[in-house]
Regions:
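Active-site groove signature of glycoside hydrolases
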Residues: 114-134
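Alpha-helix N-cap and loop-to-helix initiation/capping positions
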Residues: 28-35, 58-61, 65, 97-105, ...
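Beta/alpha (TIM)-barrel catalytic core signal, keyed to glycine-rich beta->alpha loops juxtaposed to Asp/Glu
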Residues: 134-322
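N-terminal binding-site loop/beta-alpha segment at the start of enzyme catalytic domains
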Residues: 1-81
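Structural motif
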Residues: 39, 43, 116-117, 149-150, ...
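Short, acidic/polar
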Residues: 28-40, 101-117, 165-169
Length: 322
C-alpha cells in the first residue's frame, strides 16, 4: 500500500480507502461487511470513511455495523486505523436534524456517531455539504469545538467548491483548527474540481483531497461494456447516472477499456490510477459489495504512472476525438 501525506499535515492516508456509503447498512449481510473490512485492512487500507446518514434501511446503520465489526476483534487495532465520519445532510426529524451546518446539528450528530461506533473520537470529522443558510463562522467553530473537546483529531469539508473551501480555510487558520482535507467527487467522467480549480487550490494551500465516486457510481467498470446487466446498480435503478449509459457513453467505455487492457489493467483499475495520478489527490474512496472487488481495486496502486501518449489517448476519448 502507498501512504500519502494529507496536504501539509502529519496525517498519512492509504492511497486506497474504503467507503461505507453503500453495502454496509442493515439490509446487507453482516458477515460480508466484516469480510470486506478485514480484507481491506489486510491489504494495508487503514482509512475507513463513514457518515451519519450512510446505511439502509435507516440512517446511521453503517456506523452501527462498523461499531459491531470493531467489537469483533478490530477494536484492538484502533491506533492503526484512521476513521472519518461526516454530518451535513438530513438526518432526523424536526428543524435541528435537517440539511444544515449549524453548531447544534453538527455537535449532536458527532455525539450520535461516536455512540453508534462506540468510539471516544474520530480521526477526521467533516461537514458533509456546504450550507448557504448558516454562517461559515458557525460551521467552522462547530468543527473546531469538536477538536478542542477531543472528539475529533482533524476536520474536513466535503462537497465544497474552491471558493467555499478558501473561505472556510481562512477561518480555520484564525482558529488554528487542523483543517486537512476536502472530499469531492472526481473521476474521468466528472472533472469539476479541475474546472473549478479546487485541486490546484488544495495542492497550493496544503489541503488534502479525498475523492469519492472515482468510478463514477460504478459506471467506469467492464460491467457495462456491452449493455446494462439486470443485477447491476443501473439495472436495479440504484444510481441516478443510469440515464447516461447511451451508445456514445458505451463507446467511450470500450475505448478506455482498450487502453486499460494495453496497460495490463482492468477499466476500473485504470480509472482509479488516473485519479491518483493527479498530484493533488491524497486518497480515493472505493465502494465494494464483496471482498474480491477490494482486492482488485487495490491493485490499481501498482500502475499510477501514465505515459504522455496514454494521457493523450484518454483525453481524446473523453473529448470524443477518438
Amino acid at each position: 500500500m502507498i501512504y500519502n501525506r494529507c496536504g501539509k499535515s502529519g496525517l498519512k492516508l492509504s492511497a486506497i480507502s474504503l467507503g461505507f456509503w453503500k453495502n454496509f447498512g442493515h439490509n446487507g449481510v453482516f458477515s460480508n461487511m466484516e469480510d470486506m473490512v478485514h480484507t481491506a485492512f489486510d491489504l494495508g487500507i487503514t482509512h475507513f470513511d463513514l457518515a451519519n446518514n450512510y446505511g439502509n434501511p435507516y440512517n446511521g446503520s453503517a456506523e452501527e455495523n462498523f461499531g459491531r465489526i470493531l467489537d469483533r476483534g478490530m477494536r484492538e487495532f484502533r491506533d492503526e486505523l484512521c476513521i472519518s465520519t461526516k454530518a451535513g445532510y438530513e438526518m432526523w426529524d424536526g428543524p435541528y436534524g435537517d440539511r444544515n451546518g449549524s453548531r447544534k446539528y453538527l455537535t449532536a450528530s458527532l455525539d450520535q456517531s461516536l455512540k453508534r461506533m462506540k468510539l471516544d473520537y474520530v480521526d477526521i470529522f467533516y461537514h458533509h455539504v456546504f450550507d448557504p443558510n448558516t454562517p461559515l463562522e458557525e460551521t467552522a467553530l462547530a468543527l473546531d469545538n469538536a477538536v478542542r473537546q477531543g472528539k475529533a483529531l482533524y476536520v474536513g469539508v466535503s462537497n465544497y467548491n474552491a471558493r467555499q473551501t478558501e473561505e472556510i480555510s481562512a477561518i480555520f487558520k484564525e482558529l488554528k483548527t487542523p483543517f486537512v482535507v476536502n472530499q469531492p467527487s472526481y473521476s474521468m467522467m466528472n472533472r469539476w474540481i479541475e474546472e473549478d480549480g479546487l485541486d490546484r487550490w488544495a495542492e497550493e494551500n496544503g489541503v488534502g483531497i479525498s475523492v469519492f465516486s472515482p468510478l463514477y457510481q460504478g459506471l467506469l467498470t467492464d460491467k457495462y461494456l456491452g449493455g446494462i446487466p439486470e443485477d447491476s446498480r443501473v439495472g436495479r435503478g440504484d444510481t441516478w447516472l443510469g440515464g447516461q449509459l447511451d451508445d456514445d457513453f458505451r463507446k467511450k467505455l470500450n475505448a478506455l477499456n482498450d487502453v486499460a487492457h494495453e496497460r495490463g489493467q482492468k477499466l476500473s483499475q485504470m480509472a482509479l490510477s488516473w485519479v491518483l495520478h493527479n498530484s493533488a489527490v491524497t486518497t480515493v474512496l472505493i465502494g465494494a459489495s464483496r471482498p474480491s472487488q477490494i482486492v482488485e481495486n487495490t491493485e490499481s496502486i501498482r500502475r499510477i504512472d501514465f505515459t504522455d501518449e496514454e494521457i493523450a489517448r484518454i483525453e481524446n476519448i473523453l473529448q470524443n476525438k477518438h
